[in-house]
Each structure stands twice: as C-alpha cells, then as structure tokens.
C-alpha cells in the first residue's frame, strides 16, 4: 500500500503540539487592521488551539502528523 500524502494546505497552516493538540494562526490579521481596536489586534496575536471537532478533520489530512 502506498504512503498517504499530507494535504499541502495543512502543512502550511497547522502545527501539532507534543500532546497531540492542533495549533493554528488566527484569521483576519493580514490587512485592514486600522478598523480594529488595539485589544482585538493584541488578543489575536500568535496562535490558538483548535477545538477537538476541527482537530479531528486536520488529523485525517495529516496522517503522519506535523512537526
């Protein structure tokens, strides 16, 4: 049986933690930030952890995990 390929979009967008949780960047931070207040920009900095329901889909698309 051939090896399963990881979806290329998943490689670019997600990382797995050591405990198996899935981290992702917060959406809506590329441009037009002048209309948002400083608190919104500050709290959406960095990464977040996906919910378990969404993480299950990502794990299907990355069969061997990501570093």
Curated annotation (Swiss-Prot):
A Pfam entry, by short name: Ribosomal_L35p
Single Gene Ontology BP annotation: translation
Keywords: Ribonucleoprotein, Ribosomal protein
A single Gene Ontology CC term: cytosolic large ribosomal subunit
Alphabetical list of InterPro entries matching this protein: Ribosomal_bL35, Ribosomal_bL35-like, Ribosomal_bL35_CS, Ribosomal_bL35_sf
GO molecular function term, any single one: structural constituent of ribosome
Top-level taxonomic group: Bacteria
Secreted is among the record's keywords: no
Disulfide bonds, paired cysteine numbers: none
Family that this chain belongs to: Belongs to the bacterial ribosomal protein bL35 family.
HAMAP family in alphabetical order: Ribosomal_bL35
Protein name as catalogued: Large ribosomal subunit protein bL35
Protein species of origin: Sphingopyxis alaskensis (strain DSM 13593 / LMG 18877 / RB2256) (Sphingomonas alaskensis)
Underlying gene: rpmI
